[in-house]
């Protein structure tokens, strides 16, 4: 399982990036209830800023036992599609649904689980490394290169006039008491 605070770190990073001119207090006041998280546009979609090609890769990794991101037979059917459906269209509808964020959260969790699986296969445990997982979530599968000294980074995000990297923002959130009553540390 993915610690909900770690998963949320990636989503909050996307939200801060989208609302980069807002202060932390503004973000907390408007988005804390998690009822009106922004649906991002242009190249990434939904509350989690998912790219359609990343979602397609997550799906492929679920069913490809040769993939370094494969989670095992027990996870192959975690994402299903209606028979004879256009999977691309269904995926897009799922990650852009503003009334139901289930698939956005599911895909973020699956992405992180797949990254963790890749690193575990290489002998490294990053399952509790919020900043590293958020960095890799921000950068994408092709930047995930397991090593003994992973670095927090990613896109720059301005918060209250201060610049953070995407991963550093997630790490700061994870270690803070922000939303701790709703998302306690596991």
Model segments located where?
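Catalytic glycan-binding domains that act on GlcNAc-containing polysaccharides
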Residues: 1-186
